[in-house]
Curated annotation (Swiss-Prot):
Record flagged with keyword Cell membrane: no
Cofactor(s) the protein needs: a divalent metal cation
Protein name: dTTP/UTP pyrophosphatase
SUPFAM superfamilies assigned: ITPase-like
Primary localization: cytoplasm
GO biological process annotation, one example: nucleotide metabolic process
Coiled coil spans: none
Cellular component, GO, one term: cytoplasm
Protein family (similarity comment): Belongs to the Maf family. YhdE subfamily.
Catalytic activity: dTTP + H2O = dTMP + diphosphate + H(+); UTP + H2O = UMP + diphosphate + H(+)
Site entry (Important for substrate specificity), positions: R13, T67, Q153
Keyword Repeat found: no
Length: 194
């Protein structure tokens, strides 16, 4: 029998996405500092945070991820408050931006262990938003705990005009790439088990 996968995240979206793969999960959120370091490139940032989360949580097989919206080289994490969400949405309005997710799988099955990771990028084109749309959306509360202040799988999806790449990446976890990392780490996926 395969070990249960430990998800080092409190994100309900990641839990739901992994549920789509039929994986049994133990959820153990990692307590890590998610601030961007001065001069840290966005790809390095999401990978560093994902690795730190995976290393902070015990378990035989641990999966961690970190997602950021990137506009003009600036990492847009979760907004601090409603005004910060408005600022982010104004900045994203009418632009193309990138959503990056760093994914790390750590397996402690041997003395050496295995750590595999990847960064997945998805390009998103956002509609032009007026103040009324932004105020309404912020008023729903939905953007307040989302990287970049929007949820493609929620009401924020109405503002997305085009997606190039993994849609599940924009939600918070690139499923195809995550399944490939788990497989490479020797973690059997449900359809591979006898």
């Amino acid at each position: 029998m395969a070990p249960r996968l430990v998800l080092a995240s409190q994100s309900p979206r990641r839990r739901e996405l992994l549920g789509q793969l039929g994986l049994a999960l133990d959820v153990r959120p990692a307590d890590t500092d998610e601030r961007v370091l001065p001069g840290e490139p966005p790809r390095d940032y999401v990978l560093r945070v994902a690795r730190e989360k995976a290393r902070a949580v015990p378990g035989e097989v641990v999966l961690a991820a970190d997602t950021a919206v990137v506009l003009g080289g600036e990492v847009l994490g979760k907004p601090r408050d409603a005004e910060d969400a408005r600022r982010m949405l104004r900045a994203l309005s009418g632009t193309r931006h990138e959503v990056l997710t760093g994914v790390c799988v750590r397996r402690n099955a041997s003395a050496l262990g295995v750590e595999l990771d990847a960064v997945v990028a998805t390009e998103v084109a956002f509609a032009r938003l007026g103040d009324a749309e932004i105020d309404w959306y912020v008023g729903t509360g939905e953007p307040l705990d989302k990287a970049g202040a929007y949820a493609i799988q929620g009401s924020g999806g109405a503002f997305v005009q085009e997606v190039r790449g993994s849609v599940s990446n924009v939600v918070g976890l690139p499923l195809a790439e995550t399944a490939a990392l788990l497989r490479r780490a020797g973690f059997p996926l449900p359809w591979e088990q006898p």
